[in-house]
């Protein structure tokens, strides 16, 4: 019989407070460090993570993860993609034998494409999409995780292994033969029965965030049956997050599980009627996704009501993977700093609440939290704003097309890029020197102009039709704007993992948003002065700015989005006055904020479309508005993409084998569209045959008069040799396709 715990967190970040894993991975990939050093760095990081929870009585432990938990699970289950089977086992240097196949699946090789990558539920974290088929057979190998777990036990850590659950793993998988991944659910539960028995631990945590989504009743029956079998092992803890736990409790309560975890933040503390107190309720009352301080008094009151019904433990609403490590090194103005809690502060909040629930209240800490909550509520910087909004509509698309054809005079199948070009060491060095004040702002801006000179010249040499300035001045497509808008702040060390070795530093949107001055106009003007071709003005859209920031939670997202949209509308007007004929307003994140339950989706889609249109509707009809979208499974949102009313929509498509085309075709999409023909996330130059094939597939689904030719995403993370070689292939493919269709615009 297991003993209950009283305090924990749902999970921990893996990248390191100083991004140690990022730098070790990049060193291993470029050959500057050996595998043993990478393995040692990863071990040090998991030890440090476990030690950070020394005040809690149960520690989640996912082992040394080198890229992504879903990819870790695929490796444990023996279902890394078959195309990487010929990669030999790794030498015994502390890394798993399968690590080179694992990295091949994550990043691709010179000849093999990587697995698809998309967003983890409605977050800004990315996972690698498992590839299965009807013939998939699971071959269990948890030896690396078991070894890591034993190391923690030797260190005296009360660790519990954390696994991605069978339902979630299969719900997020894709098949290569059109079969249903969930057909494997009974077989996978049998594998998990063996897997959890292999752990010599009191508790085993199995994460099932898929249980907060819409799940078919017959699948829920299979899930209940599967977990009834797993519950024969003591100490099985099924954790859910990113939504209400009611469906999970309706499915799993009373079947003999040791614990069930629920998110009490995303939709608040719901009734949880199915919980009768038979199992430990792990109450996710501290927000694991956002960075606002917890109202400890309100949280304690909710916990006490639950504790009257049965045993509970205090936890975070989800893994702390999604928030920065600590406020400790941040130089943030005191008023706003008091409103915030990063990872280590949230761990402290969990401990404070657990102690208070046990009768040991830290009155000073609770008083400080209450004062911070009151300060935020009454600050003039967060006061509601009432204003009349301008219109959200432009002229008809037919009218706009006619005017834009005359204004732009582009060829059929026009070629362009998404916006950014390589952020070279010299660019990063100039930015770092500016931060350290070792160069002046004037010297920095001259270095950026020199980079724009290079980018424009190379694009003209390659023969691209519509150019970009390359965005050398932008550290990040959201952070750049947040640093120029009132109502935001930037952190110095607020890094979170986006995927693999890529980390981002989300800005904090803490108050009312406004634009004190133009943000991009001078860079556009300089770039346009260098060429006779059209240069796109480049902006990030309101939904993406919200999605990739930590956003205030004290007013509706729709209200905050409209504030950002109005600032962008002013910027668009200034770009047009400066001569811009094409303006791109990127919304790569528009799908990732889509609610997980169908009932909640219409309201989100309405306000997200409204905010984009509020930003862009001031543009004259002869100005072409572009937008760009990433990681987008378009079947669910295609009607909203149409409703955005952008003249051209470029879409990440190459990595998913042009799956977006079916949605475009079935919807009768009549606007301009550019499904990406080069997967920029894999470090390889696409072959002419590969790009030709993707472009041919696009032409079979899209009218040539609508079609643009472009990469999947921006080129910021790629190197110049790869970029030039790949764009050369892309431009040549477009030229040959033009000859075949014999069309001009």
Swiss-Prot record:
InterPro entries: Cbl-indep_Met_Synth_N (IPR013215), Cobalamin-indep_Met_synthase (IPR006276), Met_Synth_C/arc (IPR002629), UROD/MetE-like_sf (IPR038071)
Cofactor annotation remark: Binds 1 zinc ion per subunit.
Enzyme Commission code: 2.1.1.14
GO molecular-function term, one example from the UniProt record: zinc ion binding
Binding site for L-methionine: 418-420, 471, 586
UniProt binding sites for 5-methyltetrahydropteroyltri-L-glutamate: 19-22, 119, 502-503, 548, 592
Keywords per UniProt: Amino-acid biosynthesis, Metal-binding, Methionine biosynthesis, Methyltransferase, Repeat, Transferase, Zinc
Catalytic activity: 5-methyltetrahydropteroyltri-L-glutamate + L-homocysteine = tetrahydropteroyltri-L-glutamate + L-methionine
Needed co-factor(s): Zn(2+)
Pfam families: Meth_synt_1 (PF08267), Meth_synt_2 (PF01717)
Domain of life: Bacteria
Pathway: Amino-acid biosynthesis; L-methionine biosynthesis via de novo pathway; L-methionine from L-homocysteine (MetE route): step 1/1
Amino-acid positions noted as binding L-homocysteine in the UniProt annotation, renumbered to this chain: 418-420, 471, 586
HAMAP family the UniProt entry points to: Meth_synth
NCBIfam families hit by this protein: met_syn_B12ind, PRK05222.1
Function, in words: Catalyzes the transfer of a methyl group from 5-methyltetrahydrofolate to homocysteine resulting in methionine formation.
Family stated for the protein in its record: Belongs to the vitamin-B12 independent methionine synthase family.
The protein's name in its UniProt record: 5-methyltetrahydropteroyltriglutamate--homocysteine methyltransferase
Gene this protein is translated from: metE
